Structures are given as C-alpha cells and as structure tokens.
C-alpha cells in the first residue's frame, strides 16, 4: 500500500511538472508571437476554417503559420544573409572612391604656359610681327630635316604659335583631361597624351614631310578620342555618357568648322597665320582611341571587348612601325641623295676647272 501511494504521488508530481512546462511553453510562444507578428493575414487569426487558414497562410509573404492547440502563431522565416555577388556594379564601386589627383594634366599645362611666356619674354623684337614668331632653329620645333633628333617628335608640344593657339589647347585639355585622369589615373592619361603627341609628329612626317610642327593638338585630340574609348568600354556604368559624347562631337565639329572657315573663307590677316595640321589632329585622335582601349580601366568585361583590345593593339602597332620605318628610309635616302649630289657637284666643278 505504501508503494502504491508513493507511485500515485510521483505520477501527480510528473503531471504537474508537465502542465507547468506546457504553460511556460505557451507563454513563450505568446511572447514570441507578439514580437514577430507583422501584418498577420486575417485568415491566420481565425481558427474556424482550417482550409481557409492553410490557403491564406501559404500565401503570406516570408511568414509561416503554425497551430498549437487552440492558438495560432505567426512567425517570420529566418532569411539567411547571402553575400552580394561579384557583379560589374560592385567592381565599379571599387573605383568610385579611389579618385586620382590630376597631376599630369595640371603639370603639363603649367609647363606649356611657362615655356610660351619665356619665349615671348626672350623673343627678339623683330619676331613679334611674324605669323609664327617662333624661330625655326629652336631645339624644340619638329623639323623634317632633323628627324634623327628624336626628342623633336615630342618637344614640339611645348611651343605654340600665339596666345589663342595656347589658350585653346590648354582649356580643352583641362576640360576633357581632368575627368579622365581623376577616374583612370595619372599614368594612363600620361601615356595617352604622349602617344597622341608622338603620333601627331609621326603622321605629319609621313603625309606632310616638309612641314614644321608646333603645338599640343595631337595630345589634345588624343584625350578627346580617349573619351570615346571610355564611353565604349564603360557606357553601361556611366550616368553622363551621352553628355560626354555630345560634348566631344560638338567640340570637334566647331574646331573643324572654324579651321575650314579661316582657311577657305576668311581673308583677314589672322586667317593668313599658321595653318592647322589636320594630319596631326587625325593621327593624334587615332592614337588616343587605340591606346585608350588598351590602357583605360574597364569596369565591365564583355567578350567582344577582348576583340576590340587586340584590334586596337594591332592598328596602333602597325601605324607606328610603318611610320618609323618610313622615316628611317626617308632620312637615309635623303642623306644618300645629298651626298651623291655633292659628289656630282664636285665633279662638275672639277670638269669646268673651278676649284
């Protein structure tokens, strides 16, 4: 009897503990429901219609309905935090906050202004009335008869015919060069600018082989063409691509129209000044476009852009190699003809009895 009484008491204790446990669980669920329920559907709050409950609760966005006894609890599903994919936009954001100070464009502009001012200050008085007051024997002028002085293919960019020529190039290279350098960096823009300058003198040496050359227009047009390369590579990631393209087209159109007007329709003394080297502009732009495809940052790689890269490399290398070989052959030929001419002249003078 004592054992039976003890078993009954233990059973009562167990039942009491289970009831207390169930009560505590219900309180916990009720508290959790208050904290997690957000915009509970009407069907989820009604327990009278089971089919309606199942249908409506299954359509609740990112929620889960459960029954426990007489109560219905709404709990949000745990949505795992998935890492963002390495998309093109994320690749672009890596560069947005890494902007570069435009050292190259600012420094090259200051140097060009300083050299122009120095030339004007030290210029002989008789040169001020000339259309191009720069002396032809300057060590910076590109001269076709001194092609072996290789620095002249670059140094001519520091000289300008007049204040208008200088100011025009400075304004344009600041306006178009600074945004490119801020985004793509000093080294890339420096390479593009110098490639345009070099291409300008190379192209002139091939097409207008007797022309002297001054001015930084080859580098300026390289920057303009680099904008086209940048737009082609990163159009989908640029907010003002159409505006940039329009500004380049407007500038080139105005510059070309002004050059044609002054050459063919304007009879003023200003129009009779130094002629514009269209070849330097064109070859500078070609260099800027091809080198731009090669060195500018590409924020979204696509399959066809690899083909553009190789095509640009091939075009630039072919043009450069052809121009260099042409200059070497032309220079050697000219020297041989000059030496042969001197020999022939000496023979003629000897035959005529003139020492």
Swiss-Prot record:
- InterPro entries for this protein: Peptidase_S54_rhomboid_dom, Peptidase_S54_rhomboid_met, Rhomboid-like_sf, Rhomboid_IM_Serine_Proteases
Result of altering residue 217 to A/C/T: Abolishes protease activity
**Compartments in which it is found:** Golgi apparatus membrane
Q: What main location does UniProt list?
A: Golgi
Q: Which reaction does it catalyse?
A: Cleaves type-1 transmembrane domains using a catalytic dyad composed of serine and histidine that are contributed by different transmembrane domains
Protein EC: 3.4.21.105
Any Gene Ontology CC annotation? Golgi apparatus
**Do the record's keywords include Transmembrane?**
yes
Question: Where do Basic and acidic residues bias regions lie?
Answer: 11-32
Cytoplasmic topology: which positions?
Answer: 1-98, 184-188, 232-244, 297-308
Q: Which GO terms describe its biological process?
A: axonogenesis; behavioral response to ethanol; brain development; compound eye photoreceptor fate commitment; determination of genital disc primordium; dorsal closure; epidermal growth factor receptor ligand maturation; epithelial cell proliferation involved in Malpighian tubule morphogenesis
Spell out the Polar residues composition-biased ranges.
Answer: 1-10
Q: What class of enzyme is it?
A: hydrolase
Q: Which residues lie on this side of the membrane: Lumenal?
A: 120-162, 210, 266-275, 330-355
Q: Which GO terms describe its molecular function?
A: serine-type endopeptidase activity
Question: Any idea which UniProt keywords this protein has?
Answer: Developmental protein, Golgi apparatus, Hydrolase, Membrane, Protease, Serine protease, Transmembrane, Transmembrane helix
Extract the ranges annotated as region (Disordered). Answer: 1-34
- Enumerate the transmembrane spans: 99-119, 163-183, 189-209, 211-231, 245-265, 276-296, 309-329
The SS bond pairs are: none
- Pfam families in the record: Rhomboid
Membrane topology type, per the record?
A: Multi-pass membrane protein
Functionally, this protein is described as follows:
Acts early in embryonic development to establish position along the dorsoventral axis and then again later to specify the fate of neuronal precursor cells. Involved in EGF receptor signaling; cleaves Spitz to release the active growth factor.
Q: Which family does it belong to?
A: Belongs to the peptidase S54 family.
Q: What is this protein called?
A: Protein rhomboid
Organism of derivation: Drosophila melanogaster
